[in-house]
Amino acid sequence: MACKVKAELEAAFKKLDANGDGYVTALELQTFMVTLDAYKALSKDKVKEASAKLIKMADKNSDGKISKEEFLNANAELLCQLK
């Protein structure tokens, strides 16, 4: 992964990790998602469902949260698929 992209993704993870514990939880993800126009029109239940799906996709060790490593790996995988 290119250094610039990695730095941008690390900055994004830091914003998502609201309490700074090194993990993004479903609640942190939901809190962020409702600030985005794409999610504002959705009900709370739909946002909760979307965050659960995102966590499931990235959470490789099935602990219910996304570590920085899992976040970086999921984004790297996605970016490779899009190229």
From Swiss-Prot:
Ligand binding (Ca(2+) 2): 59, 61, 63, 65, 70
All residue ranges annotated as the EF-hand domain in the record: 4-39, 46-81
SMART domains: EFh
Keywords from the UniProt entry: Calcium, Cytoplasm, Metal-binding, Repeat
Subcellular compartments: Cytoplasm
Keyword Cytoplasm applies: yes
SS bond partners: none
GO MF annotation: an example: calcium ion binding
Superkingdom as given in the UniProt entry: Eukaryota
Transmembrane domains' residue ranges: none
Annotated GO CC locations: cytoplasm
Chain positions recorded as Ca(2+) 1 binding sites: 17, 19, 21, 23, 28
Pfam families reported in the protein's UniProt record: EF-hand_7
Expressing tissues: Selectively expressed in a small group of neurons.
Function comment: May function as a trigger protein which interacts with a larger protein. May mediate calcium-dependent signal transduction events in the growth cones and axons of a small group of sensory neurons which fasciculate in a single axon tract.
Protein's name in the database: Calsensin
